[in-house]
């Protein structure tokens, strides 16, 4: 079974041994024996920083009777760990960096699941990170229902000089609701809401402390009020792209 949204022209050749797939920024290739340990991957958890990945992995290993932690050799770009069915990977900051990590991780999962669409569909994907809340108390956990860019439109890329590629920014509603339900007895606030992904840390987030500043306190508050009025719960830098690529 195939889907036109998957690059079978390249990926099928990896499965039949015509060529390797080199996950360059992770320092491994499809021919590396280390990937055999990842065949039972059930979830991919992404985060911005490598330090957070180490913390997640060590804690998950402890919760699973000290299961072996597998580390990829290359860490100058992204830090990657695997233990107890979960692949943890950092993606850096912002959609350009995160898109590199996500593209290579998606190719890797395709290889690990031998192109089986049903098996790939069972893999849970999640990004965990810090964000700025919009009208929320500090410490509130936001489970994203949709990822949009700073203009409240979905993620899109330039298609040369001919137009744009647009991507669907919705996250699976049932998954979001299940995460919230599983945490209803915790001691922190958890809600669902729209997440804005800024494509630039200072300008697109209307910050006033950049070397280049094009906004005023008035325009910043106007933007934040507009976001709040349109159901936005938080602001970060990757969600719109991650939703778009995984939906595709």
Give the label of every model feature segment.
Residues 131, 146-147, 195-200, 240:
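Histidine- and/or cysteine-centered catalytic micro-motif in compact active-site loops
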Residues 133-135, 203, 244:
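Conserved protein kinase catalytic core
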Residues 168-231:
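Active-site rim beta-loop-alpha module in soluble metabolic enzymes
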Residues 221-248:
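A C-terminal functional module that forms or caps the active site or interfaces directly
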């Amino acid at each position: 079974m195939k889907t036109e949204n998957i690059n079978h022209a390249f990926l099928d050749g990896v499965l039949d041994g015509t060529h390797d797939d080199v996950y360059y920024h992770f320092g491994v290739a499809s021919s590396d024996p280390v990937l055999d340990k990842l065949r039972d991957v059930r979830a991919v958890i992404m985060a911005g920083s490598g330090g957070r990945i180490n913390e997640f992995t060590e804690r998950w290993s402890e919760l699973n009777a000290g299961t072996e932690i597998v580390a990829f050799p290359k860490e100058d770009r992204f830090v990657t760990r695997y233990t107890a069915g979960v692949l943890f990977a950092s993606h850096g900051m912002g959609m350009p960096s995160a898109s590199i990590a996500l593209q290579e991780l998606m190719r890797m999962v395709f290889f690990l699941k031998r192109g089986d669409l049903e098996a790939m569909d069972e893999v849970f994907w999640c990004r965990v990170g810090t964000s700025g809340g919009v009208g929320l108390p500090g410490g509130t956990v936001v489970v994203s229902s949709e990822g949009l860019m700073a203009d409240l439109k979905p993620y899109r890329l330039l298609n040369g000089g001919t137009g744009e590629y647009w991507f669907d920014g919705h996250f699976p509603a049932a998954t979001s609701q299940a995460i919230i339900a599983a945490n209803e007895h915790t001691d922190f606030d958890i809600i669902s809401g729209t997440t804005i992904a800024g494509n630039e840390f200072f300008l697109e987030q209307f910050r006033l402390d950049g070397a280049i500043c094009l906004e005023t306190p008035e325009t910043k508050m106007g933007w934040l009020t507009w976001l709040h009025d349109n159901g936005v719960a938080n602001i970060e830098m990757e969600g719109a792209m991650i939703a778009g690529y995984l939906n595709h």
